[in-house]
């Protein structure tokens, strides 16, 4: 059972990270009902240009304030834009510049929500923080474990894998025991302003604009050739950073002589030559990997890898658990899968599980092909 469901001492002060969404709104309400001293905090992590219509921060703040007014709690505001730029966004740009595909949400959780926000809340006198993430915390053997959320469609442990046990010990996850429809029902029952608000999608600082339009504001495009597996040049790309492994849309390839009607997919990036390598078919052999190498591993709690471990892993959000064997090598960590994995993407995260416990994860450095002969 999660500590978030236990009765709370009335003297425990909790500050809830209020995003202006339904999950954090209901989190604050549930904690209030459980007897905690509850306050909210809205964090601004991105400084948009004057007049922009992309960022929803103003609307989100208004929604968070409306919810806090409704349930009768104070709302603090904090600006972590400088920390976000230094610790999340610059890394995001560097990864794209290097031809990789990063996941800024994971860094944002580690550096902002469970570091900058946690530190700020403690400075305000909080005993604990809370968020609206769909995960659970279990305290066992003197340490706090990260468990999957009970709603398999909303479990967010993949995004929180880099948060340490010490930070988890100071955090409550009130909706981790619930399914999304239950959360919305609670919000509607209490007439919260966010009850029917759509879930946010995409990267927070990009909003609704096209990703390529956003990226070229910060990084110069480097056009190059698109090649088939046999080396034939069949097109041009605007920049490797705009493409990811397994991508189908936006390649601009079609009507080639002697080619089948099957769609084209990004198979690989040749960073040395600035070449995008593509092939036809959703199950093209080049799309599959039997193993991967990972670095920058963060464990929620220490893990003994003196011998290989049989675990499960996800190489992308909402993927089903994939059986693998993990071992530590001189180059980092190597995960070998029982079933070849499609579109293993350098820069993305691989996250490891032991049953419902999220152990941690790292950044995918390299995918190993599942057959001989691939470049």
Curated annotation (Swiss-Prot):
Region (Interaction with tRNA): which ranges? 154-156, 316-317
Q: Which residues form a coiled coil?
A: none
> Which reaction equations make up its catalytic activity?
S-sulfanyl-L-cysteinyl-[protein] + uridine(34) in tRNA + AH2 + ATP = 2-thiouridine(34) in tRNA + L-cysteinyl-[protein] + A + AMP + diphosphate + H(+)
HAMAP family reported for this sequence? tRNA_thiouridyl_MnmA
Molecular function in Gene Ontology: ATP binding; tRNA binding; tRNA-uridine 2-sulfurtransferase activity
* The EC number(s) this enzyme carries: 2.8.1.13
Which PANTHER family does this chain map to?
MITOCHONDRIAL TRNA-SPECIFIC 2-THIOURIDYLASE 1 (PTHR11933:SF5), TRNA 5-METHYLAMINOMETHYL-2-THIOURIDYLATE -METHYLTRANSFERASE (PTHR11933)
Catalytic residues per the record? 108, 204
Q: Which family does it belong to?
A: Belongs to the MnmA/TRMU family.
Q: Where is this site: Interaction with tRNA?
A: 133, 348
* Protein's recorded name: tRNA-specific 2-thiouridylase MnmA
Q: Please give the GO cellular component terms listed in this UniProt entry.
A: cytoplasm
Q: Which SUPFAM superfamilies match?
A: Adenine nucleotide alpha hydrolases-like (SSF52402)
Which keywords belong to this entry? ATP-binding, Cytoplasm, Disulfide bond, Nucleotide-binding, RNA-binding, Transferase, tRNA processing, tRNA-binding
Which pairs of Cys residues are joined through disulfide bonds in the record?
108-204
The ranges of region (Interaction with target base in tRNA) come to: 103-105
Localization, UniProt: Cytoplasm
For the ligand (ATP), the binding residues are: 17-24, 43, 132
> Which NCBIfam families does this chain map to?
PRK00143.1, trmU
Q: Name one GO biological process term.
A: tRNA wobble position uridine thiolation
Functional summary from the UniProt entry: Catalyzes the 2-thiolation of uridine at the wobble position (U34) of tRNA, leading to the formation of s(2)U34.
